[in-house]
Structures are given as C-alpha cells and as structure tokens.
C-alpha cells in the first residue's frame, strides 16, 4: 500500500525567499557565468544562431610553370610533372635514376641481397626482385655472383647517387579553386574580382604581403610547410596545400575569402629509415626496326602536392536561435540547484531552510484544517482580492 500511496502523489514547487548575502552573491555569480558562456561562446564564437552547411563542393585545377636543367638536359613541365592533366594531386620530379635500353631476357640481379654461391640459394623461397627467378646462380661481375632472373635486362641499380634539379625551387604553381555551399546555393572562387591579368604575371603568394595571390612558388610552399628544399628534393615527400573556406553568410559576399595553410602529410614516413620520402617508377617504351621492344626505366623522386579544400558556411535561422535561447534560459536554473545544495548542507540555518523548503500535506491534514478554519467560496474570493501575500516564505539571517 505504501508503494501505491507514494505513486499517487503530487509535488509542486514552493517559493522560499532566503535573505542571505552569501547565497545571494553565489546565485548571481553562477547566473552571470552561465549567461556569459552562452553569450560569449555559444552565440558569438560558435554562432549557435546560424544553420551551417558543411557539405562543401569543390573543384581544383592546377598548372605548374618553369624549366630546369637535369643531366645536361633542359626539362620543361611535360618532363617533370605527372599527371599532366592539372588535377588537385600532382608530382614535381626532382631526381631520377635512369636505367636505359632494357630488353626482355635473362640477366643477374644487381642487388646485394641476391648474392649467392650455388643454385640452391636461388630457389622460389627467395623474394622476387626485378623479374622471375630462374633458380640459377650466375656471375654478376668478376667478384660477385647473384641469382639470375627472367625479365627486363639489365636490372636497375638504384643505389647510385644522382643530382637533384635545384631549379624546381623557383617553379610556380597556379591554383584555381571553385567552391559551392549547396544549402545556400552560394558559389565563389579563389580568383577574387580585384585580381587583374597584370597581377597574375607578377604576384606571388605570401601569407602576410599577398595572401590572395593564386600563384605559389614551390620553394615558398616547402618553407611554409617547415621543410628544407634540398633534403625534400633528394628523398621526395608529400606536401599538403590546404585551402579553407569558413564563411559567415550574414556578412557581405566579399567577406567570404580563402585561407591557405601548408603541412607535410607524410611526416611519419620521413622519420622511417626503411622507406623515407616518396618515389615511384615509370617507363618509356620504344621499338627497334626489327620490331623488338626496349624501354628506359626511370625511378623518380619528387615532391607530391595534395591540394585539400575544406570549409563550412553559416547563416541566420530562427530555429537554431530559438533552441539555443531556450537552452540558455534553462541553464540559468543550474544556479538554483547549486544554491539549494549549499543551503541544505553547508550554510548556517540549514535545518530551518529544510523545514520551510520541504513540507508534506496529506488528506488528513487538509480535513483538520478545513474543520478548524472553514473558508466559503465567497469569503475566499474576498480574501484573494485583499491579500498582498505572494505565497512565499521569507527566511532572514
């Protein structure tokens, strides 16, 4: 019966005015902190009154310009940039190991790890190298024997030191970026309206002096990413050119501007002694008059650039404004909860506050009160009109 009786109960708030400087100051300070948080952080910094679009649509077109001297050859864009289509990911080759006149046939491996003394050491359990192992141990030189392979011969010797193309430091990268926020049908590009054809010939990007120039010098990008060009060109690496679009669409159209930043994306592999840097292989194929095919194999070291576009846009909307405002007003009540905890447990006179704060009224109490002090509806109406009592208890200290 007690469980049923407890279930069918009703609780209502009771207003108790506590005249205490201590608890009053705590209450106002907590309320001030909560209001300051919502006004300063939630509304002004996080712009909780806006609806945001994070599904940015973007396209990137790149173009590299410059010529360099490598191995007594003048190299232009067609020689050192891959892929040539001008995508958001491209490589500028800075060093190459060239193996010329390779033809299909049988030849000894060139790597030291394929050293052998007898055919038994060239079985299928050995890791494959530049071709398919034949199982024979043959002479590589007068002092070295290695396992024989079937494939493109002669095999590559990638341990030789080759120079780097230092002219690449002064190459330029032109970036054309277009973005769109579909929720607001807002479009813009990094080629700002005040940019002229003359500017395109002379300007170079600088975060302070010219932050909106779309032409970047390779050496500057490497420096802004905190890298050394000579070291990076020798081993290769991956750099990120990040373009950020964080736009407040409640402001003017020209206030939505790109922000460039630079970083090294493969910094983990940079510290590895097993496979530092970035390199890849490709081949150029030719045919002799008799129809035989041969090729030139190139192991290329270079700087890979990844143009990464990110961003979001916000605009005023009544729904998030109402939700955030309600959350702010509701959170002010946290001060009341904190003050109640202090009053009930820590302040002098806590027992008196508990007696006024929590009062239990049952049906028996109501019947006794009605018999001892009957109130008729007409008298009650008169009393309500003349009463100035707010219904609140006041506790003074």
Curated annotation (Swiss-Prot):
One of its GO terms (cellular component) is postsynapse. Changing residue 178 to F: Does not affect the inhibition the allosteric inhibitor AF-219. Has high sensitivity to ATP. Fast activation by external ATP. Exhibits rapid desensitization. Sensitives to the ATP agonist:alpha/beta-methylene-ATP. Subject to allosteric inhibition by AF-219. Mg(2+) and Ca(2+) slow deactivation of P2RX3. Ca(2+) binds at residue 158. Its main location: membrane. Residues 44-322 are extracellular. Belongs to the P2X receptor family. This is P2X purinoceptor 3. It comes from Homo sapiens. The gene is P2RX3.
């Amino acid at each position: 019966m007690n469980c049923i009786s407890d279930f069918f109960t009703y609780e209502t708030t009771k207003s108790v005015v506590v005249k205490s400087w201590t608890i009053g100051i705590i209450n106002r300070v907590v309320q001030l902190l909560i209001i300051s948080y919502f006004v300063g952080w939630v509304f002004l910094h996080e712009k909780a009154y806006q609806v945001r679009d994070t599904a940015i649509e973007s396209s990137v077109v790149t173009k590299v310009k410059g010529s360099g001297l490598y191995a007594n050859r003048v190299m232009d864009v067609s020689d050192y940039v891959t892929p040539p289509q001008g995508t958001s990911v491209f490589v500028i080759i800075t060093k190459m190991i060239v193996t010329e006149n390779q033809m299909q046939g049988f030849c000894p491996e060139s790597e030291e790890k394929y050293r052998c003394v007898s055919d038994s050491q060239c079985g299928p359990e050995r890791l494959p190298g530049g071709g398919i192992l034949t199982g024979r141990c043959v002479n590589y030189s007068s002092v070295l024997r290695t396992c024989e392979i079937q494939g493109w011969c002669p095999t590559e010797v990638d341990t030789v030191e080759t120079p780097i193309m230092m002219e690449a430091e002064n190459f330029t990268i032109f970036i054309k970026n277009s973005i769109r926020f579909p929720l607001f049908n807002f479009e813009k590009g990094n080629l700002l309206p005040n940019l002229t054809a003359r500017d395109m010939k002379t300007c170079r990007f600088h975060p302070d002096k010219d932050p909106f120039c779309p032409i970047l010098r390779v050496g500057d990008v490497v420096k802004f990413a905190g890298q050394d060009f000579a070291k990076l060109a020798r081993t290769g690496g991956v750099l990120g050119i990040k373009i950020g679009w964080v736009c407040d669409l409640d402001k003017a159209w020209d206030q939505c501007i790109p922000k460039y930043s630079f970083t090294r994306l493969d910094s983990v592999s940079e510290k590895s002694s097993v496979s530092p840097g970035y390199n890849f292989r490709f081949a150029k194929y030719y045919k002799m008059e008799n129809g035989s095919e041969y090729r030139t194999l190139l192991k290329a070291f270079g700087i890979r650039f990844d143009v990464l576009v990110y961003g979001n846009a916000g605009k005023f909307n009544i729904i998030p404004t109402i939700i955030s405002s309600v959350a702010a007003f509701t959170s002010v009540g946290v001060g009341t909860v904190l003050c109640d905890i202090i009053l009930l447990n820590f302040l002098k006179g806590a027992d008196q506050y508990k007696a006024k704060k929590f009062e239990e009224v049952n049906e028996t109490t109501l019947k006794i009160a009605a018999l001892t002090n009957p109130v008729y509806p007409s008298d009650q109406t008169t009393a309500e009109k003349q009463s100035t009592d707010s219904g609140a208890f006041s506790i003074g200290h």
